[in-house]
Every structure is written in structure tokens, then in C-alpha cells.
């Protein structure tokens, strides 16, 4: 016997809600929710779990060896994943079109097969011949026989292929191109993506097959599809990079098997993609002599310390209001630092055109780069080059104070490893690596006084670091 009940369904994304709403809660469209009558069995049915069910057992009796991570063979990717891919896990890799997602995953399949494990690469966007052409270009088309290709867009056919091939790794490129006849909506829609992901996830966990899904992103950078897509999977990775450059980064957003804030660096080239063990060299402008308007900092991207360079240029305005051009740094934060220099250090920089940029396309998003931005602006204002062995780390407050940042010991260790011998930092009890002198400034005025001191000692080490109280102001003249 069945009971009739009412539901409310969006005509655009097919999202179902229990009550009527003027605006769809899923896609945000207005006036698309209509009432529909559905039949349900008396008592209803229970929703099947995505993960295989098991009885209650003591945690000490659970065998965890079968779920140990399997290395992919790509060290930078394994770093983000927490050592490798866990059998039965589902990983979502999202990124902009053309950033290199397919190239990276084809390289993963190649390394996976080289270790004697079978991989199935399913594409709903390319034919098997097109995938083979790309595999030949990056050098992984003929070396191994354990890579299987399938050009399919029906999820049930993909599940049959998994049963037939019996792979240890399945790559689906992409989840938005897969469809199922058991769900309404168009391919790539919210309902279809949710149903396809649930079916693939259930199959992966039931067969202990590692599954990697490729996801599209919207113009705002968010993962396309329902929010539940990120809840269904075990790992969410974002693949980022400037299409005009070769640097690529994989950021962990969610990871049930490791840290969720790791970052892997890659270099995309004509013959594939390679991991970068020491990416700091990409973010530094190698020059033999110091140049005014530059400052070095160490930022933490997740848990990874990266050395970056800030460049500043001040120019006389050509009529009208002064310009502010910022690249790689938050414009609002750059304006705040300029205001602090104007107010507390009495540097008349607001009347100038201000240009700020980072080297190598690096994005400085954390406050630890504030001090480097301030020093770069002051150095450009006074035309005072700083030694290339100095690094600046610290947050600048509106009161002109220099504040501590987390992970200072890790940052200083990375700076020392890169050959820096002078560190301008806020007061703290963090240990300083051997061979490095720490100049501790509590205010922006004291930091600028230290800047003048180390500029006078260019090319030499400071045997005895100077001490400043941080009161008053630094009479920096405008350089020519």
C-alpha cells in the first residue's frame, strides 16, 4: 500500500524540499519551485549508507593495515594526501579549465601502474585516442600495460568496467560529465552529480578501490555542483595556478586521513608535470646587487614555509589622484600598511603612485608579510637598498606595532636554509638558527631604524645587532 504525499521540486536543478519556498535553496533561482505528488510505501525505506555497514566491534580489533596509504609515486602529491591514497577512499580534485588536472592524474595513473598496480582512467570529455595522444606526449603511453582507458559517460557502464577490470585505482574525468538514469535532471546538474558521486563512492568503498574524481569549478573558484559533493568524498584538493605561468599548486581543503592544510608545488611543461622540491627559488628574483624597494619574507602556505619577495615602486603622479596598483597582495592590507607608515613613521608616501608586486606570481595572503611590505615601501621611498641576506617577518598593527606570527621557528629555519643571515622580526622567545642574527622590533619605527642600520652594513654580517627603543620617528629623506 502506498501513501500520497506532497513535495516541492525545483524545475531548474530538480532539488526537492519538504515545503514551498520562493527561492530554490540549491540553485538560488526564484519562482522555480512547484508542488509535485509522489507515492511512498507505508513506513518508508531506509536510505542506504555510502560506506559498507559493519557490526559494532572494539576499536582494538579493527584491522587498520588494509587502509594504509599507498604512495602515488609523486612526492608532492603524497605530501598533500598524507602519504598516499588510501584504498577505498574517494578524492575530489577541482581546478580551473586548462590548469593541468588531466595531465597530473594521467601521471598518477602512470606511476601507479609502474609499481605493478592496475589503474582505470575513465573520461567523459575525451575519447580513448585523445587520452593516448596526451599520454604519448608526456611519456607514459607505452611503458606499462596496467593502465586501462575507457571513454564513458554512463555511471552504470563505469561500474561494470570496474567489476571487469578489477583496478586498484579509478580516475573519473570528470564527475560533471557522468550521468545516471536513476536520477532526474540534466548531466552535470545538482541531482545528477549527487547521484553519480554516491554511486561511485559506494562502489569504491565496497570494493576497496581508490577513486579520484575530477571536479569543475565555477567562475568564483567554488566547486561546481551541490555542497553535499564535498561531504560525500574523503579528500578535497584544489589545483591552482596561473595559466600564463608554469607554477601549479595542489592545496588540501579536506582530508580524513591526514592534515588538511598541506600544499604541493608542481611545474607544468610540454612533457608533463613535475613536483618541485624547493619552490622558494621560484619566488625570489636572483640579482647580484641589492635594489631599493625590495624585501624578503617567509610565508606559511599551509604547513609549508615559502620564501617570497615583495617589490615596491613609488612614482610621481601624472595628474589626478595617485594610483594604487597591487599584484599578489591584498589591496586593502597594502593600503592599511601605507597608512601606518604615513601616520606613525611620517613617511609622505600617500601623495605618490604606489605599485606593489610579488615575484613569480606568489600570493601573500597571511599577515606575516606585512613587515616586508612596509620595509619595501620605505626602502623605495628612501631609495635605500637592503642587503640580499635580510628577511622580514611580522604583522603590522594599526597602532604601528609589530606583532608575532605563528610558526616563527619554522620560518626562520627555512630562511637560514636559503642562506639568509639577518631576520627582522617582532620580539619573541622563538629560537634563532645558528649563524642568523635576529633584530627584534616592537614598532614600525624601530623596524625602520633597523632598516637603516642593516642598509649601512650591506655585504657584511652584524657582529652585534643594534638595539632600538622604537620611539620617535626615522627621518628618512625621499631618495632620488
Curated annotation (Swiss-Prot):
Gene3D superfamilies per record: 3.30.230.10, P-loop containing nucleotide triphosphate hydrolases
SMART domains: AAA
The protein's Enzyme Commission number: 3.6.4.-
Annotated spans, Disordered: 459-480
GO molecular function: ATP binding; ATP hydrolysis activity; ATP-dependent DNA damage sensor activity; damaged DNA binding; zinc ion binding
Signal peptide residue numbers: none
Lon-protease-like: region residues: 353-480
Mapped zinc finger ranges (C4-type): 10-27
Any single Gene Ontology cellular-component annotation: cytosol
Motif RadA KNRFG motif, residue numbers: 254-258
Record remark on domains: Has a putative N-terminal zinc-finger, a middle region with homology to RecA with ATPase motifs including the RadA KNRFG motif, while the C-terminus is homologous to Lon protease.
Assembly notes: Interacts with DisA.
Cross-referenced HAMAP family: RadA_bact
Similarity remark: Belongs to the RecA family. RadA subfamily.
Protein function: DNA-dependent ATPase involved in processing of recombination intermediates, plays a role in repairing DNA breaks. Stimulates the branch migration of RecA-mediated strand transfer reactions, allowing the 3' invading strand to extend heteroduplex DNA faster. Binds ssDNA in the presence of ADP but not other nucleotides, has ATPase activity that is stimulated by ssDNA and various branched DNA structures, but inhibited by SSB. Does not have RecA's homology-searching function.
Protein name in the entry: DNA repair protein RadA
Species of origin: Mycobacterium tuberculosis (strain ATCC 25618 / H37Rv)
